[in-house]
């Protein structure tokens, strides 16, 4: 430590302007000394005490606190914006669902109209099918009546007799000799034959007769 000693004049006994002055006896007065101001760098207690901080340290701490507060405010703002966006998305989905429900409640009337149209079309198709069936039945009845008329009419034997010689097969001598026997057996079947069984077979009509008048 540096101590600086200074000498001062002795004040009168009545004046006490210097409180640091001491007087033990009125005869002898000791001089007073002053200590210089100690700087923080020369103070060992200040260097040894880590808890005590100066004004610069306090400003640094305040600045770091402000940085954390800004980061916190930014994160809170981002979270709030995301939450707001989620709420908007859910509201949009709910609105779409509600709109679809209203549309489904309004649609049954046109569906009824379509069902009526379908029923009308089906009725028309059924009527057309019934008409076609009746026409087909009528055509079948007319064809059946025509067939019955053709069956009830007697066969035209003159047409069979007037057939061309090509239609009738030629008779061999063996079949000619067998004709009288077959005629006797078939006589009761042909009631329209006026010829007797004993006549010659040359009287039978055939396509290529060789008799001449």
Swiss-Prot record:
<keyword id="KW-1003">Cell membrane</keyword>
<protein>
    <recommendedName>
        <fullName>Neuroligin-4, X-linked</fullName>
    </recommendedName>
</protein>
<feature type="topological domain" description="Cytoplasmic">
    <location>
        <begin position="95"/>
        <end position="213"/>
    </location>
</feature>
<comment type="similarity">
    <text>Belongs to the type-B carboxylesterase/lipase family.</text>
</comment>
<keyword id="KW-0130">Cell adhesion</keyword>
<feature type="topological domain" description="Extracellular">
    <location>
        <begin position="1"/>
        <end position="73"/>
    </location>
</feature>
<feature type="compositionally biased region" description="Basic and acidic residues">
    <location>
        <begin position="46"/>
        <end position="55"/>
    </location>
</feature>
<keyword id="KW-0628">Postsynaptic cell membrane</keyword>
<keyword id="KW-0472">Membrane</keyword>
<keyword id="KW-0812">Transmembrane</keyword>
<feature type="region of interest" description="Disordered">
    <location>
        <begin position="1"/>
        <end position="56"/>
    </location>
</feature>
<feature type="modified residue" description="Phosphoserine">
    <location>
        <position position="109"/>
    </location>
</feature>
<keyword id="KW-0770">Synapse</keyword>
<comment type="subunit">
    <text>Homodimer. Interacts with NRXN1 in a calcium-dependent manner. Interaction with neurexins is mediated by heparan sulfate glycan modification on neurexin. Interacts through its C-terminus with DLG4/PSD-95 third PDZ domain.</text>
</comment>
<dbReference type="InterPro" id="IPR051093">
    <property type="entry name" value="Neuroligin/BSAL"/>
</dbReference>
<keyword id="KW-1133">Transmembrane helix</keyword>
<dbReference type="GO" id="GO:0007155">
    <property type="term" value="P:cell adhesion"/>
</dbReference>
<feature type="transmembrane region" description="Helical">
    <location>
        <begin position="74"/>
        <end position="94"/>
    </location>
</feature>
<dbReference type="GO" id="GO:0098839">
    <property type="term" value="C:postsynaptic density membrane"/>
</dbReference>
<comment type="function">
    <text>Cell surface protein involved in cell-cell-interactions via its interactions with neurexin family members.</text>
</comment>
<keyword id="KW-0597">Phosphoprotein</keyword>
């Amino acid at each position: 430590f540096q101590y600086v000693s200074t000498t001062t004049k002795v004040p009168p006994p009545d004046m006490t302007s210097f409180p640091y002055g001491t007087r033990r006896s009125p005869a002898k007065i000791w001089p007073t000394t002053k200590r210089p101001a100690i700087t923080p760098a020369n103070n060992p207690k200040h260097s040894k005490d880590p808890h005590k901080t100066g004004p610069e340290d306090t400003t640094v701490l305040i600045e770091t606190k402000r940085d954390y507060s800004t980061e916190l405010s930014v994160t809170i703002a981002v979270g709030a914006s995301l939450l707001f966006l989620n709420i908007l998305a859910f509201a949009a989905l709910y609105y779409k669902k509600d709109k679809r429900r209203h549309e489904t409640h309004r649609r049954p009337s046109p569906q009824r109209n379509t069902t009526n149209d379908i029923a009308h079309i089906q009725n028309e198709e059924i009527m057309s099918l019934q008409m076609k069936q009746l026409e087909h039945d009528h055509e079948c009845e007319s064809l059946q009546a025509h067939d019955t008329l053709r069956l009830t009419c007697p066969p035209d034997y003159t047409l069979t007799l007037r057939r061309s010689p090509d239609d009738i097969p030629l008779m061999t001598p063996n079949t000619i000799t067998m004709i009288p026997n077959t005629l006797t057996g078939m006589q009761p079947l042909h009631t329209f034959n006026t010829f007797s069984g004993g006549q010659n077979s040359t009287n039978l009509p055939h396509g290529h007769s060789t008799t001449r008048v």
